[in-house]
């Protein structure tokens, strides 16, 4: 089932320097909660500056949903320490609030209790909040409070020069984009390994279902927790952060222009379902528009091709201008065993897996095959640790035992690990392979099995409160290592100033501005 990567691995072993200079970045979302686990109702803390313009600390869907962002970094330890500093400083500024350490929220009774993220009075700020109003009206506010970690990854130019002979210009843009699309296609085919190893949402609180019927065969504990005994990541299931209405958009990952055309089509395609919501009611705007996607960011995807946008530029226009610059991996649950929601083992694994995905042959995929890959993901998400579980290839009928496929993959990853270790010295990447490959013979070592044991004993609420309290105390006591308090204060003040400048520069009424952007 695993493609034959032996030739590409042999090439890599002859060109180890091609991997020198991998760049990464991390984003982590987390809900602010009170000591009893309920959602904080306070505004975004003033000490953290403006959520609209702060470089490192912002908000996602809700006013209480923090998002931490590291700068692009070539050093894993430095990146993780930077992320930890963001958590340390924030923990000191939250008063009695703490950061929820799980992907799935628990103590939220009603979607109406969730205040949308606020970004001030500028047209840009109001647009961001209106987009969130649309998400709430389309999918419900509760789904939008599910948290995750995003891992951004790019290969150095030296890799593309050695592998594809690229120089500069239009040809380089096309070849590099083609390489990243190969990575993405392999991710759709084999990325289920991420929830298998690191999924950490095998259960949900009963309040999350809100009385809605479900066909999933949940088991229920006395305290009202619903779980699937072999599940890995309900966050990635249809119960979690997905969008069924997008499954027939026909967006493919074979060619830059095709991909962008599909995305632009979805933004312009009217939706009967969303038209029923209405765009405006009693003078209040309910969504940006009633198209399948309000804006490009609404496209749900476990992985995204990205390029840093210029002012006023859409993500797809940035891709057309310069090609794919980096990849955003979006399938990581919050790691409940780390105070910052992600750890070094995960980052090193993702490095290895991304390199493997770009090396392995990946035939082009139709939108039908893309939908078929969902079958493997769904199996792993809902019953990944089940003994005897098998996986298929695309839409074919042949089945393969998951543990065998996983171990075959890790044989390749071990060779990538040896190459990366030869550049950096030490055996850190190989150690990660040795630790993680054991999860295929013993699923009890996976994140989902470990956290489920705690949840069955303590409930999701009890587990979340205990971990959150421990991490709050730990982070508040740890000294800052990279950033200094003065730098946080300077960025707070600068972000507030930037927001004020944006607001002062706005001369156009929001309705007129929106007419041009909706």
From Swiss-Prot:
Q: What is its EC number?
A: 6.3.2.2
* Pfam families xref list: Glu_cys_ligase
Give the molecular function GO annotations: ATP binding; glutamate-cysteine ligase activity; metal ion binding
Q: Which reaction equations make up its catalytic activity? A: L-cysteine + L-glutamate + ATP = gamma-L-glutamyl-L-cysteine + ADP + phosphate + H(+)
The organism encoding this protein is: Salmonella gallinarum (strain 287/91 / NCTC 13346)
Q: In which pathway does it act?
A: Sulfur metabolism; glutathione biosynthesis; glutathione from L-cysteine and L-glutamate: step 1/2
**Known InterPro entries for this protein?**
Gln_synth/guanido_kin_cat_dom, Glu_cys_ligase, Glut_cys_ligase
Please report the name of this protein according to its UniProt entry.
Answer: Glutamate--cysteine ligase
Q: Does the keyword Nucleotide-binding apply?
A: yes
Its signal peptide is none
Q: What GO terms in the biological process aspect are recorded for it?
A: glutathione biosynthetic process
Protein family according to the UniProt entry? Belongs to the glutamate--cysteine ligase type 1 family. Type 1 subfamily.
Endoplasmic reticulum recorded as keyword: no
């Amino acid at each position: 089932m695993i493609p034959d990567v032996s030739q590409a691995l042999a090439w890599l072993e002859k060109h180890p320097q091609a991997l020198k200079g991998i760049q990464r970045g991390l984003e982590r979302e987390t809900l602010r909660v009170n000591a009893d686990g309920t959602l904080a109702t306070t505004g975004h803390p003033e000490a953290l500056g403006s959520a609209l313009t702060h470089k490192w600390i912002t908000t996602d869907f809700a006013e209480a949903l923090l998002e931490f962002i590291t700068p692009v970094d070539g050093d894993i330890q430095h990146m993780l320490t930077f992320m930890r500093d963001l958590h340390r400083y924030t923990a000191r500024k939250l008063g009695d609030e703490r950061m929820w350490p799980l992907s799935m929220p628990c103590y939220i009774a009603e979607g109406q209790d969730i205040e949308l993220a606020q970004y001030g009075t500028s047209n840009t700020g109001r647009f961001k909040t209106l987009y969130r109003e649309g998400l709430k009206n389309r999918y419900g506010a509760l789904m939008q409070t599910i948290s995750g970690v995003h891992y951004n990854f790019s290969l150095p130019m030296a890799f593309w020069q050695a592998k594809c002979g690229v120089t500069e210009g239009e040809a380089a843009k096309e070849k590099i984009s083609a390489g990243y699309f190969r990575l993405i296609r392999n991710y759709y085919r084999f990325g289920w390994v991420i929830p298998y190893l690191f999924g950490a949402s095998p259960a949900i609180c009963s309040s999350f279902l809100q009385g809605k019927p479900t066909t999933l065969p949940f088991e229920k504990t006395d305290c009202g927790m619903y779980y699937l005994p072999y599940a890995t990541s309900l966050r990635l299931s249809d119960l979690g952060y997905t969008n069924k209405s997008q499954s027939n958009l026909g967006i493919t990952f074979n060619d830059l222009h095709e991909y962008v055309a599909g995305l632009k089509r979805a933004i312009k395609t009217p939706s009967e379902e969303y038209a029923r919501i209405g765009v405006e009611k009693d003078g209040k705007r309910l969504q940006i528009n009633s198209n399948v996607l309000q804006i490009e960011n609404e496209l749900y995807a476990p992985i995204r091709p990205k390029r840093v946008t210029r002012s006023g530029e859409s993500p797809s226009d940035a891709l057309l201008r310069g090609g794919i610059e980096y990849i955003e991996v979006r399938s990581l649950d919050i790691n409940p065993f780390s105070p910052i929601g992600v750890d070094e083992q995960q980052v090193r694994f993702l490095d290895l897996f991304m390199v493997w995905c770009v090396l392995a042959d990946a035939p082009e995929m139709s939108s039908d095959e893309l939908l078929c890959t969902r079958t493997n993901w769904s199996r792993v998400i809902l019953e990944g640790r089940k003994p005897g579980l098998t996986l298929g290839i695309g839409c074919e009928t042949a089945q393969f035992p998951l543990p065998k496929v996983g171990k075959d993959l890790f044989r390749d990853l071990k060779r990538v690990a040896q190459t990366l270790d030869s550049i950096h010295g030490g055996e850190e990447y190989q150690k990660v392979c040795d630790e993680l490959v054991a999860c295929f013979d013993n699923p009890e070592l996976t994140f989902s099995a470990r956290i489920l044991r705690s949840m069955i004993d303590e409930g999701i609420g009890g587990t979340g409160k205990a971990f959150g309290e421990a991490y709050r105390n730990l982070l508040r006591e740890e000294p800052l290592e990279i950033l200094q308090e003065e730098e946080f204060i300077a960025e707070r003040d600068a972000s507030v100033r930037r927001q004020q400048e944006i607001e002062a520069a706005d001369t156009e009424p929001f309705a007129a501005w929106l007419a041009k952007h909706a």
